[in-house]
């Protein structure tokens, strides 16, 4: 699975990405992963460069939020240097498909991205089904 994901990363705008391996957490299997973090790194002056693609990017993310796949998403820092999207009820393949379709990625606003399993153990009661039992 991760080797196929690495092949998908090779686009003209993206630098090589270090993928977090699920095998780095041997006590947990992929089936235990309930949340993922998609992290984007943006080009310099991203505020201006993302503007022509922002509406379509937000539309794509909003569709997945309505489907309960993305639970939080937004830029990091001000002015933005990247973005974070927290996913649930999904797979690495589905997140990768989102990345491939994202106008920010297609148009060079994103310079690097990573998908990491998020092994949450504490959270609000609305997320109790997403937490790992320890």
Segments from the language model and where they lie:
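Conserved, structured core segments of small domains
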Residues: 2, 13-134
């Amino acid at each position: 699975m991760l080797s196929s994901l690495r092949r998908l990363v090779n686009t003209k705008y993206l630098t090589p990405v270090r993928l977090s391996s699920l095998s780095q957490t041997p006590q947990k299997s992929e089936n235990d992963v309930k949340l993922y973090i998609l992290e984007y790194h943006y080009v310099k002056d991203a505020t201006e460069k993302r503007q022509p693609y922002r509406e379509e990017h937000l539309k794509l993310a909003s569709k997945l939020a309505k489907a309960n796949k993305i639970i939080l998403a937004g830029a990091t820092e001000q002015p933005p240097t990247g973005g974070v999207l927290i996913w649930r009820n999904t797979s690495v393949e589905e997140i990768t498909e989102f990345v491939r379709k994202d106008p920010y990625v297609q148009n060079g606003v994103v310079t690097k991205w990573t998908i990491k399993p998020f092994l949450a153990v504490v959270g609000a009661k609305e997320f109790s089904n997403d937490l790992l039992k320890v």
